[in-house]
Swiss-Prot record:
It comes from the Bacteria. PANTHER family: UNCHARACTERIZED PROTEIN YQGE, UPF0301 PROTEIN YQGE. Belongs to the UPF0301 (AlgH) family. One of its GO terms (cellular component) is cytosol. InterPro entries: AlgH-like. Pfam families: DUF179. NCBIfam families: PRK00228.1-4. This is UPF0301 protein BQ03640.
C-alpha cells in the first residue's frame, strides 16, 4: 500500500457561496491527493444517476442473473458523482480494513482504490466495512486549487472517517460547516479586508 503526501490530502474542501463553477456549488470535496503536480478529490455530496447494480452490470462484474440476487444493502449502495474529470472511471474511498497492491493510504484509516477488484469485493459483501463509490473526480492543475482557495472559493476543514462515510448526502454541506463552527445561514460570498 502506498501513501500520498501533500498538505491538503485527507482534508475537506467546502465550496463557498460565491463559488463561480456551477459543478461545485454547495459541494463538499474530499482531497485524495495534493502535490506540486496538482490536486485530485472526490465530491462527497452529489449522487450519480446510475445505481450500483447497473454499474456492476455495465462493468461486467456481475451478470443479469446475479443482479437479481444482490442483497438489499448492495442494491441500494449509492454511487456518487465524484467530479467532472474522467466521468466514466470509478473510484472508491474506503476504510483501511481492505487493501490491495493498488490501494493508496490517503489519511489515517482512509484509503483510496480504483480497481475492479474492490467493486467485486463490495458486491460480494467482502469489501471494506465502509466505502464510498464515485464516478469521476475533481482535478486541479498545479497551483489552481491554491488560487481558488486564496480567492475565497473554498474553505478547508479536517474530517473524520465517520463524517466521510455518512450516508445523509443532503445534509453533508451544512454539517461540514457546522463542524467548523460556522452557521450556514451566516456564510456570505464576499470577504472583507482590513
Amino acid at each position: 500500500m502506498k501513501q500520498r503526501d501533500g498538505f491538503l490530502g485527507g482534508q475537506l474542501l467546502i465550496a463557498m457561496p460565491g463559488m463561480n463553477d456551477n459543478r461545485f456549488i454547495r459541494s463538499v470535496v474530499y482531497v485524495c491527493a495534493h502535490s506540486d503536480a496538482g490536486a485530485m478529490g472526490i465530491i462527497l455530496n452529489q449522487l450519480h444517476h446510475i445505481d450500483f447494480p447497473e454499474l456492476l452490470l455495465h462493468l461486467g462484474v456481475i451478470s443479469g442473473v446475479q443482479k437479481k440476487h444482490l442483497s438489499e444493502p448492495i442494491k441500494n449502495f449509492p454511487v456518487r458523482y465524484g467530479g467532472p474529470v474522467d466521468p466514466l472511471r470509478g473510484f472508491v474511498l474506503h476504510s483501511d480494513d481492505y487493501t490491495c497492491k493498488e490501494t493508496v493510504l490517503v489519511a489515517e484509516k482512509i484509503c483510496f482504490t480504483a480497481t475492479i477488484d474492490i467493486l467485486k469485493a463490495i458486491s460480494c459483501e467482502q469489501g471494506p466495512q465502509h466505502a464510498l463509490i464515485a464516478l469521476g473526480y475533481a482535478g486541479w492543475k498545479p497551483g489552481q486549487l491554491e488560487t481558488e482557495i486564496s480567492t475565497n472559493g473554498w474553505l478547508i476543514s479536517p474530517t473524520s472517517p465517520s463524517f466521510l462515510f455518512e450516508s445523509d448526502l443532503s445534509r453533508k454541506y451544512d454539517e461540514s460547516l457546522i463542524r467548523m463552527g460556522i452557521n450556514p445561514t451566516y456564510l456570505v460570498s464576499e470577504m472583507g479586508h482590513a
